[in-house]
Amino acid sequence: MRMSTAHLSILAAIAAFLPLTVASGAAAEALKPFKDELFSDQTVIESHDNGAFQTIDYQEMRDINGRDQISEKRVKPAYVETGVRWKAQQDETLPLGDRKLDVTRIGPASGQAFTVIFIHGRGGDRRLGSNDYTFGGNFNRLKNLAYNNGGTYYAPSVKSFDSNGVADIAALIRYSYQQSGGKPVILTCASMGSFVCWGITRDAESVKRLKGMAILSGVTDPDFTKSAFYKAKLPVWFTHGSKDPVYAAADQESLFEKLYKARYPTRFTLFATGNHGTPVRMTDWREVLNWILDPQPS
């Protein structure tokens, strides 16, 4: 049917009031760029499995010493935009049923287009995931990507990495999902925090509310294929340093290969010569979030 100019004008007006594309699960360009020239310009030195596995050129002298004003403590000003902290950041204690959880929230408390939750590792708390200047400014980028695209980012303080910690995050997932009106929730976990991610994969009620997951420098779950998350075929992206002395990259690579061969939606980014903290510094959040929101087959 031929559309008149009036029809097109009406459609354009309707589109202007629709939610962001991330809410409808569209396209790899769902999130608008934020400092991509500084964070996304990474050199792929090896790739296989149709590009699902990529090895990235990582160099400590360039990616830490060349990027930080004070090594590992304060990134150079060009890498951050701190206005988001004053406009949209709030420390709060959420009452979640019979639980209470300390979080830093960036973005709206309700009606968000999507939610990202980051779980820190041992010795961390909500301050780690909301610090603008450490880890090369990568959390500041995550905060801005969420806020600038109508989303909400939560950095909770996880008191333990056992069933109690899993229950706390399950409650946060449920809360975020309800507050947004059923929009996508993405769970991301670093280091020992990955115990929480793997625990959540076994919770069928949480899995119903999740869009996908990212594991940074995490442990491997040999029973992942028995989980509700696996059965739902939700996407998972791994990032790891090749010289991680805490959790061996080879273990996660083995799990990735098993998933990939089963045609499971998965990606793996390996940072050549990278250490345990490298993925928290170097993970390209825009690439990871866009793919989880709309995973492309290999």
What are these regions (language model features)?
Residues A232, W237-H240, D244:
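Short beta-strand/loop motif that positions the catalytic acidic residue
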Residues G97-L145:
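Short, surface-exposed "cap/lid" segments of acyl-processing enzymes
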Residues F139-F161:
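Conserved alpha/beta-hydrolase
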Residues P265-S298:
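C-terminal catalytic histidine-bearing segment of alpha/beta-hydrolase fold enzymes
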